[in-house]
Amino acid sequence: MIMQDIRLRLEPQHSKATFISSSSASSSSSQTAETTLIETAEKSPASEAAAGTVTTTSPQHFFHHHHPPAHPHPPRQQPHPHSHSHPHPHPQLQRRPVEQLHLLHSHHDVQELSGQEHPHPQPGSHPHPHHLRSPSSEEDNSPTEMNNCRRLVDKPPLVKRLTMGIGLLRGTEDSRPLMHSTCGSSLTSGSGCGSTQTISDGYVNEAICEPDKYVASKFGDSCRQSLSALESATQRLQVELPAASKKYLRETCSANSSPKLFPGHSALRLDNLSLAEQQELKGAAWFQAGIPREISLEALSRQSPGAFLVRQSSTKPGCFALSLRVPPPSPRVAHYLILRTQRGYKIKGFTKEFSSLKALITHHSVMPELLPVPLTLPRPPSTRSQRSQGAYAGGTGNGGADFEMYGSLNDFRKMMADLNV
């Protein structure tokens, strides 16, 4: 049987295809055909072959050239006796890199691979003939210095420090990766901890940093402002109320929440009262600013109707509360809110306004207005002692006059109540 060795050579100057076929006698029991496909970087041939048929490519079209065995071309080169042929590119084709795609060993392989197209290689690429790898895989697997630097940048600072080594690049910014998360990358820029920080082997001593800047760098400006507001409130209250007990609580756990001040039950807050009003109410037995609501209920429940106390409101800051003992049909103790107005004070729901708390209480002790009962002013403790001394001395003391004045006011109140004025 005739074996055909067909080789395709492309001439870059004439663009012609030369077919070289060699015939030799072989054993009649085996029919094999060796076909070597050579593709230039600019043209992609289709590997379609049949018995005695080779498909070649032109710049635009595919042509099928049939060469009968009766008229073989004279061979220019004897085929190599080995089973595998290793073609060498022509010297004129050095400018066009040639890639050997596949070596067909038998006629059966040619028929199986007919109709399949090989991928077009990119111009200028020189892949290995036996190991074809993509540029991305080669770039990832290549141990170049550029890839190492790129991987080190993507890692966290601490992992980056451990990867590079303790003593590697010491004295540069990469040898101090933890400075960026604490106090900044520059020591003399004025940001972060300032110029007095100490660096030991790339790590910053955070104990000597300023608290405000350290908190701002760690938790943000909102937390720093919250702590600053808390410190200012503490200093202000320590100056104004040094003996009062204070308790600080935070409503939420977030850094944006502002600190809240909740006073104790015994705290005395007279910020909304002037000094004259404080001196005026200092000797009043019915004014108990710091008494809580529960204690006022317990104290007034054992008194007769008309007994009252004025305390500071626990629900409305800056306002006062009037706790009044009322007759039995109603609840034992009723609470009225005393509001602060531009003119002074008034009871919520009432129309009349008064210049001071004492004037308001004095008026409602005589004229109950909308209260269920008039306010009963408590007798001062000094009145009883002076009354006993005056009675013992024959009524010549000043205590008797004060007692008589207090009694006349009560009589006047009763008379006005009877007249329903």
Swiss-Prot record:
Detected along the wing margin, with high levels of expression in two stripes of cells on either side of the dorsal/ventral boundary and lower levels of expression in a small region at the anteroposterior boundary (at protein level). High levels of expression along two parallel stripes of cells on either side of the wing pouch dorsal/ventral boundary, and slightly lower levels of expression in a region either side of the anteroposterior boundary. Also expressed in discrete regions of the wing imaginal disk outside of the pouch. It holds the Pfam family SH2. GO terms for biological process: negative regulation of epidermal growth factor receptor signaling pathway. GO terms for cellular component: apical cortex; focal adhesion. Residues 18-94, 109-154, 173-194, 372-396 are annotated as: Disordered. Residues 109-120 have a biased composition (Basic and acidic residues). GO terms for molecular function: receptor tyrosine kinase binding. Residues 62-89 have a biased composition (Basic residues). Disruption phenotype: RNAi-mediated knockdown in adults does not result in a visible phenotype. However, simultaneous knockdown of EGFRAP (CG33993) and PVRAP results in the development of ectopic sensory organs in the notum and blisters in the wings. RNAi-mediated knockdown in the posterior compartment of the wing disks, increases expression of PEK. It comes from the Eukaryota. Signal peptide: none annotated. Residues 286-379 form the SH2 domain. SUPFAM superfamilies: SH2 domain. Residues 21-30, 181-194 have a biased composition (Low complexity). Keywords: SH2 domain. SMART domains: SH2 (SM00252). PANTHER family: SH2 DOMAIN-CONTAINING PROTEIN (PTHR15832:SF2), SHC (SRC HOMOLOGY DOMAIN C-TERMINAL) ADAPTOR HOMOLOG (PTHR15832). May interact (via SH2 domain) with Egfr (when phosphorylated). Involved in the negative regulation of the Egfr/Ras signaling pathway. During wing morphogenesis, may function redundantly with PVRAP to inhibit Egfr activity and prevent uncontrolled cell growth. This is EGFR adapter protein.
